[in-house]
Swiss-Prot record:
This is Ribosomal protein L11 methyltransferase. S-adenosyl-L-methionine binds at T164, G185, D207, N249. It is found in: Cytoplasm. GO terms for cellular component: cytoplasm. It catalyses: L-lysyl-[protein] + 3 S-adenosyl-L-methionine = N(6),N(6),N(6)-trimethyl-L-lysyl-[protein] + 3 S-adenosyl-L-homocysteine + 3 H(+). The lineage of its organism: Bacteria, Bacillati, Bacillota, Clostridia, Eubacteriales. It comes from Clostridium perfringens (strain ATCC 13124 / DSM 756 / JCM 1290 / NCIMB 6125 / NCTC 8237 / Type A). Methylates ribosomal protein L11.
């Protein structure tokens, strides 16, 4: 998207997001965005996250969600608004609670559209020490807090996903001063940065996505650390040497494929921290780890997700 665009938005409730999104998808719009406070407020939060949440989100908890469609200036916006209003009214008449159901329009520039999501990404404290802070926010650490500066861009890993949180908590438990850590599927570099901040001697991040590699390298530069290396390549194929800890926040099927390579990449008694595992795939991963000579030490759960910590026997 370039230049000036028209944002048409419907003020609604969380339960009406899907059908109202469908209205926009049925039009020739250039993009659809959804803002749902329940995505932020619906999970258990620590006090720091609550303190840094936008006041608008807190005020509208459970009441307001927004669906936005983006249109070219050449589009007949009056017709678009009339059509959206008509369809929202039909949903209301069908018995769906659409909340306010108001339709608004606003001219926006590409930069506004591209950065609008940032207002929902705030500092998050994970455990006792780690604070994940977006680079555009201010935060003053206290006590032993360690701040990871992050601009996730298009790469996965912001700290607010259950799988990332559990991996951070596991790293906090197992990383020691002389530890070497491999981060497989590094994404934004968040786990590599956490390992570095916790005192790891050397950290290596690997990802198949060149966008993720660039994102991780940029985030490393924000944090002024010099013990992290990021490589583009086929996971462990590009890794030399061995690690004391391998962390992989991916999906269960890929984890099972990687277990043999992880085994080769770990020192004796090395730790494998892995997440991205839904409940239905948990036992599959445990079985594979045990078949390959790992001892499962922990199975942690958060929402629909699991994090498994295993030691190479």
């Amino acid at each position: 998207m370039e230049g000036t665009w028209i944002e048409v938005r419907v003020i609604t409730k969380s339960e009406a997001l899907e059908p109202i999104s469908g209205i926009f998808y049925g039009l020739d719009c250039k993009g659809v965005a959804i803002e749902d406070p329940n995505d932020i407020l619906g999970r258990e939060q620590g006090p720091l996250t609550w303190d840094f949440a936008d006041i608008n989100i807190l005020e509208h908890k459970g009441k307001v969600a927004v669906v936005k469609g983006y249109f070219s200036e050449e589009d007949n916006i009056d017709d678009v608004i009339a059509y959206v209003k008509e369809r929202v009214e039909e949903l209301k008449e069908s018995g769906l609670d659409v909340g306010e159901g108001t339709v608004e329009a606003e001219k926006m520039f590409e930069e506004d559209w591209a950065n609008n999501w940032k207002k929902y990404y705030k500092p998050i404290k994970i455990g006792e020490k780690i604070v994940i802070k977006p680079i555009w926010e201010e935060y003053e650490p206290t006590g032993e807090e360690m701040v990871v500066e992050l601009d996730p861009g298009m790469a996965f890993g912001t700290g607010d996903h259950e799988t990332t949180r559990m991996c951070v908590q596991a790293l906090d438990k197992y990383v020691k001063a002389d530890t070497t850590v491999f981060d497989i599927g590094t994404g934004s570099g968040i786990l590599a940065l956490v390992a570095s901040k916790l005192g790891a001697k050397h950290v290596l991040g690997v990802d198949l996505d060149p966008v993720a590699v660039d994102s991780a390298k940029e985030n490393i530069s924000f944090n002024n650390v010099d013990n992290i290396e990021v490589l583009y390549g086929n996971l462990l194929d590009v890794v030399d040497g061995k690690a004391d800890i391998v962390v992989a926040n991916i999906i269960a099927e890929i984890i099972c494929i990687l277990v043999d390579d992880v085994k080769k990449a770990l020192n004796k008694d090395g730790i494998f921290i892995t997440s991205g595992i839904i409940h239905e795939r948990r036992q599959m991963v445990i079985d594979k780890l045990e078949q390959e000579g790992f001892e499962v030490m922990e199975v942690n759960k958060d929402g629909e997700w699991n994090c498994i910590v295993a030691k190479l026997k």
